[in-house]
Amino acid sequence: MESLWNQLDQFTDAPTKQMLQALVKRKQKFENYAAQCRRWRWASLICLGLLCVMIMIKSPEPQLILQEILSHTFYLFWMLATAFAYCTSYYFKKKEEKSETDFHKLRCEIIQKSTDLWPQPDKWKARESVFHMMKHKYDINLYFESK
């Protein structure tokens, strides 16, 4: 990856290179939070499903489900685990949304300042190659501001 950034020296100056590196870091941070959120959502869904299945299997009658839940601490522990998994997924969802807005703001800033970062006649072709590399290597679209 470092050699890729060294190749950018011929196309960009140092501040632009730092902006692009920060953009890649923010994208990775956003993707990490999104993966964590998905992981905890699945964990909470599995915990809830297993809790429901265990209650339905162990409960002798449908009228006694509440009594069954309150009489065994195992069910209470399982409900706490489900609630913890859900709250953790909610936490990571908020972090994901914040990191997505940070990433999108920096991406839009680079797009808006592209005429300043790459002056028109001499480095405009370099801009195109940098945008192409960012699109194909990191899946970051610098052509348009829309998400």
Swiss-Prot record:
This is Uncharacterized protein YpbF. One of its GO terms (cellular component) is plasma membrane. It comes from Bacillus subtilis (strain 168). Keywords: Cell membrane, Membrane, Transmembrane, Transmembrane helix. The chain crosses the membrane at residues 42-62, 64-84. InterPro entries: Uncharacterised_YpbF_TM. Its main location: membrane. It is found in: Cell membrane. The keyword tRNA-binding does not apply. It is a multi-pass membrane protein. It comes from the Bacteria. Coiled coil: none annotated.
